[in-house]
C-alpha cells in the first residue's frame, strides 16, 4: 500500500512516492531519467533526453492561454544519498523506505531526496493534469545538481523558448525567492611524513563524533551548527596538550553538501 496515498494534493504525492522508489543518487540517474521519458511518451508530450540524462518535456497551453509567455518549470532529478550506519540499503538498486508520521514525511534512516524530488513531482502532476489552466510549459529536469550542477552546465537550449523560469528548489511553500546559494569545492593535498610509533606502551583508541544536527550546506550552513570533523579536530588538539599521541587515521564525511553530523 502506498504510504502517501492519503496526502493532498494526491497527484503530487503519488509521483513523489514513485520517484522515491527509483534509485536516483547523483551520478546514477539513468533509471529516473528513463522514467521521465516514458512518462512523457505515454502522454504524447514532446520529450528530449540528452546524453547526460537531462530531460525536457513540453506541454501546449490550455485554452485561453495560447498567447501567454512560455513558462519553464525547472528542477533536478538527483538526490544526496546518505544513511545511518545501521541501515542496510544499496542506493544503486533500491528505493527509499518512506515513513509518514503525522504531517511529516521522512525516510527510514536515510536521506529523503525531497531536494529535489518534490519539484519533479509537482511538474509531473501539472503535466498529467487536464484541469489546471496554464500557458505553454517547458519542464526541464537536470541531472547531477548536487555534485556541481553538471546537468545544467551541459544542457543545450536550442529547443527552449520560455520567457520565464520557475526553479522549484527552494524551501518555503508559497514564497518566491529571488537569488540562490552558491557553492565551492576545494581539493587540498597536504604532504605528510609517516613515522614509526616510538611510544613505550602504545594504546590504540578510536574516537568518533556523532549525534549532531547536520543539515544541508545551502540552508543550514549559516546556523553555525557543530561539524563533526571540526569538533573531532578540536578534541584531538585538546588531548594533545595533555598526552603524547599519534594520529593513525582520520576519516569523516562522504558528501560535500551534507553537514557532517
Task: Name every feature range the model reports, one short phrase each.
Residues 27, 134-136, 242-244:
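Short secondary-structure junction motifs
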Residues 33, 116-120, 229:
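Short alpha-helical patches at coil-to-helix transitions and adjacent helical residues
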Residues 2-103:
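Acidic/His- and Gly-rich active-site-bordering loop/insert found
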Residues 36, 120-127, 232-236:
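Buried hydrophobic packing segments
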Residues 20, 40, 44, 81, ...:
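Structural signal for hydrophobic packing residues in well-ordered secondary-structure cores
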Residues 23, 94-97, 101-106, 110, ...:
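Midchain, well-structured core segments that form catalytic/ion-binding scaffolds
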Residues 65-147, 152-163:
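Active-site metal-coordination/substrate-binding segment of hydrolases
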Amino acid at each position: 500500500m502506498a504510504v502517501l496515498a492519503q496526502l493532498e494534493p494526491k497527484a503530487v504525492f503519488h509521483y513523489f512516492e514513485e520517484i522515491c522508489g527509483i534509485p536516483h543518487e547523483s551520478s546514477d540517474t539513468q533509471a529516473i531519467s528513463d522514467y521521465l521519458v516514458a512518462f512523457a511518451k505515454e502522454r504524447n508530450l514532446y520529450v528530449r533526453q540528452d546524453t547526460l540524462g537531462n530531460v525536457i518535456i513540453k506541454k501546449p497551453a490550455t485554452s485561453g492561454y495560447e498567447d501567454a509567455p512560455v513558462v519553464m518549470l525547472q528542477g533536478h532529478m538527483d538526490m544526496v544519498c546518505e544513511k545511518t550506519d545501521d541501515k542496510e540499503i544499496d542506493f544503486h538498486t533500491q528505493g527509499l523506505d518512506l515513513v509518514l508520521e503525522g504531517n511529516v514525511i521522512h525516510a527510514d534512516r536515510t536521506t529523503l531526496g525531497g531536494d529535489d524530488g518534490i519539484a519533479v513531482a509537482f511538474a509531473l502532476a501539472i503535466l498529467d493534469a487536464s484541469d489546471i489552466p496554464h500557458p505553454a510549459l517547458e519542464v526541464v529536469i537536470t541531472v547531477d545538481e548536487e555534485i556541481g550542477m553538471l546537468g545544467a552546465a551541459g544542457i543545450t537550449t536550442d529547443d527552449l523558448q520560455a520567457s520565464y523560469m520557475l526553479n522549484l528548489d527552494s524551501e518555503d511553500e508559497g514564497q518566491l525567492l529571488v537569488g540562490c546559494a552558491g557553492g565551492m569545492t576545494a581539493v587540498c593535498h597536504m604532504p605528510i611524513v609517516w613515522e614509526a610509533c616510538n611510544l613505550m606502551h602504545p594504546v590504540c583508541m578510536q574516537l568518533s563524533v556523532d549525534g549532531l544536527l547536520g543539515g544541508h550546506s545551502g540552508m543550514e550552513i549559516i546556523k553555525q551548527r557543530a561539524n563533526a570533523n571540526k569538533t573531532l579536530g578540536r578534541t584531538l588538539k585538546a588531548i594533545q596538550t595533555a598526552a603524547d599521541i599519534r594520529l593513525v587515521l582520520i576519516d569523516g564525511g562522504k558528501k560535500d553538501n551534507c553537514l557532517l553530523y
